[in-house]
């Protein structure tokens, strides 16, 4: 088994990590930063930009720059939270043929897992550049409160990116792993409060020593998969729009370019207000009307921001209360509170958490990196590099089937430790019923229609019998990734039917395979482009050095030699303008061949006359002493 990397696939930022020589290393990307913006841009020429490069061009390309796509993963288009998002993002969210929420870019419909795969590819490449070897296996984190279809969609994204996803792990659990690995032995209970860019999770985790093993057991988890830093940004954007409307009478909501600039400004202002009590947003030329250009200038204080988002922060308290209740633990019994996710840097969030749990949160856990670090530890456990660690996670939501009267009958209750398997016997509702439909549901409501539908399948050819006589055994099996497998068996005939709940990831097996092939083709194109660029650069360098050599040689070069070299130079320059790598390499070789005698002649002459060779070197040394420029600041005395 090769190296297994840990990836935190975040709503706002993503991060990749590896366990190396017993220590967890967060890997810097090509831009030199430890986290990468989860932003993907599709340029008009077909180029795909990921991360900082995508973020930089967002203002000029708002319709084709995608961010916070994780909020759409595994969701239906008609869901209220999706409809709300449609109003707030400059890109187009559309309805897929199967009813899922997809996005449209340059007239092409794309599934969220396909887009998330671009971020995962960037994380994979970051790790490969650092390790100097191919990476094919990963542990990827998801919010603890992600349902089955969202987990399956994340796994699909990994496959499209060329990764074998060895495990899907919950973000708070990963953070607890990162926190607890080096802690003193002994039992203690921690709360992981994870408020990220798009989701909120809270988990109660017990870290214990059992027979010399470091055991991390999740006692309960709760959360909200549509509450995060993006919502805080939206409140600020709305405030700026309202202020501008009051002042100018113009509504910026219909202007994608202005909204993209406002988004960037809101995010920046929010971050600044975590360390300052006031900041100013200044966006010149935000729009224009008949009277000329308009500028947006708004001063905002920390207290104003807090008043705008106070209800969002309060919304995190109910899941905390429910998690404690489900775990059967009083808040006074919590030993440590760990904050994860960039939004937890906000002083109001820290204040509320301290007040609720009655203790200060720990400051020794990096909220942006802890999740990826925990994923890397889990990867090392799966690879066998880390021993004596046992991770016991839970299923976040109740799983069951629809029974007579539209009722949801639970088979696996929420917060059940996984992996787990549970069976229950059901029967028919009508006399001589020859088939039953198994409708699999996930959620906490008693009414089946109020819960998330994960899929349906039929068990047919049941022998005729009075209602209530046939015995249909339904089995639910959740694997370590939290992904559900369902089976139904007629106990009289032994006939059975089973499915892995995966259709709701939004992609069929054929679609996933096609996307994997597309990704491989793109990868091959990228490699060819790099090789072509390298050949062009080599050719350019040779053209430059040869022209310089001919100029330096002067009349020492015969007319015949000069003609041959000039012809080879022209041929190489023409080849460089083309797209044929082999042609460029052939012309490079040709030019090297015809210019070699001149180079040898020059070298021999320098060897015979070292003083002549020293003179240009002295001139170069003098030239090196030249100061490019000196600036003196002139004070403007007005």
Curated annotation (Swiss-Prot):
Region ranges (Disordered): 605-625
KW Phosphoprotein (keyword) present: yes
GO molecular function list: ATP binding; ATP-dependent protein folding chaperone; unfolded protein binding
Residue(s) carrying Phosphothreonine: 199
Keywords: ATP-binding, Chaperone, Nucleotide-binding, Phosphoprotein, Stress response
Family matches, as PROSITE patterns: HSP70_1, HSP70_2, HSP70_3
Domain of life: Bacteria
Bias type Basic and acidic residues, positions: 616-625
Entry's induction text: By stress conditions e.g. heat shock.
Role description: Acts as a chaperone.
Family label: Belongs to the heat shock protein 70 family.
This protein's name: Chaperone protein DnaK
Source species: Pseudomonas syringae pv. syringae (strain B728a)
Chain's gene name: dnaK
């Amino acid at each position: 088994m090769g190296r297994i990397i840990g990836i935190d696939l975040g709503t706002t930022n993503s991060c990749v990590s590896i366990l190396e020589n017993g220590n967890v290393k967060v890997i810097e990307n090509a831009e030199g930063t430890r986290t990468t913006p989860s932003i993907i841009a599709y340029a008009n020429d077909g180029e795909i930009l990921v991360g900082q490069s995508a973020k930089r061009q967002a203002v000029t390309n708002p319709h084709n720059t995608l961010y916070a796509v994780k909020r759409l993963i595994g969701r239906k288009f008609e869901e209220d939270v999706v409809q709300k998002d449609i109003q707030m993002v400059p890109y187009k969210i559309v309805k897929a043929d199967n009813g899922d929420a997809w996005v449209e870019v340059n007239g092409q419909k794309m599934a969220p897992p396909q887009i998330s795969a671009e971020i995962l590819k960037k994380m994979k490449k970051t790790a490969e550049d650092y390790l100097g070897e191919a990476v094919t296996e990963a542990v990827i984190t998801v919010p603890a409160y992600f349902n089955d279809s969202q987990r399956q969609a994340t796994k699909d994204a990994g496959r499209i990116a060329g990764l074998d996803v060895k495990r899907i792990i919950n973000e708070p659990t990963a953070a607890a792993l990162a926190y607890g690995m080096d802690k003193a032995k002994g039992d203690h209970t921690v709360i992981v409060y994870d408020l990220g860019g798009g989701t909120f999770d809270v988990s109660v985790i017990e870290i214990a020593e059992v027979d010399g093993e470091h055991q991390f057991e999740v006692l309960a988890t709760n959360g909200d998969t549509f509450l995060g830093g993006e919502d805080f940004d939206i409140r600020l954007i709305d405030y700026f729009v309202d202020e501008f409307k009051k002042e100018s009478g113009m509504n910026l909501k219909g202007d994608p370019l202005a909204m993209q600039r406002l988004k960037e400004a809101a995010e920046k202002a929010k971050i600044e207000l975590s360390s300052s009590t006031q900041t100013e947003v200044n966006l010149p030329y935000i729009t224009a009307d008949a009277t000329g250009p308009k500028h947006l200038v708004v001063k905002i204080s920390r207290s104003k921001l807090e008043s705008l988002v106070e209800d969002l922060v309060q919304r995190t308290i109910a899941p905390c209360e429910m998690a404690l209740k489900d775990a059967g633990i009083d808040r006074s019994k919590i030993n440590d509170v760990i904050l994860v996710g960039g939004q937890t840097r906000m002083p109001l969030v820290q204040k509320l958490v301290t007040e609720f749990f009655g203790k200060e949160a720990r400051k020794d856990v990096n909220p942006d990196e802890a999740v990826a670090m925990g994923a890397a530890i889990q990867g090392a456990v799966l690879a066998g590099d880390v021993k004596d660690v046992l991770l016991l996670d839970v299923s976040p939501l109740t799983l069951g089937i629809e029974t007579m009267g539209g009722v949801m009958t639970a088979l696996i209750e929420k917060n059940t430790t996984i992996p787990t398997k549970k069976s229950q016997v059901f029967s028919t509702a009508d006399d001589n019923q020859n088939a039953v439909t198994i409708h699999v549901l996930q959620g906490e409501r008693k009414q089946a229609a109020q819960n998330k539908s994960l899929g349906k399948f039929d068990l047919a050819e049941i022998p005729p019998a009075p209602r209530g006589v046939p015995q249909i055994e339904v089995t639910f099996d959740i694997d370590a990734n939290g992904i559900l497998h369902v089976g139904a068996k007629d106990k009289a005939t032994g006939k059975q039917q089973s499915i892995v709940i995966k259709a709701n990831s939004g992609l069929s097996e054929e679609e996933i395979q096609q996307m994997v092939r597309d990704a491989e083709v793109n990868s091959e194109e990228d490699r060819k482009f790099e090789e072509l660029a390298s050949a062009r650069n080599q050719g350019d360098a040779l053209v430059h050095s040869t022209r310089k050599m001919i100029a330096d040689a002067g009349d020492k070069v015969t007319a015949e030699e000069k003609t041959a070299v000039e012809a080879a130079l022209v041929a190489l320059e023409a080849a460089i303008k083309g797209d044929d790598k082999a042609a460029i390499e052939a012309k490079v070789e040709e030019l090297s061949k015809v210019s070699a005698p001149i180079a040898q002649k020059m070298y021999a002459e320098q060897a015979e006359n070292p003083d002549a060779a020293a003179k240009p070197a002295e001139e170069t040394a003098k030239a090196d002493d030249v100061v490019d420029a000196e600036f003196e600041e002139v004070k403007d005395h007005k």
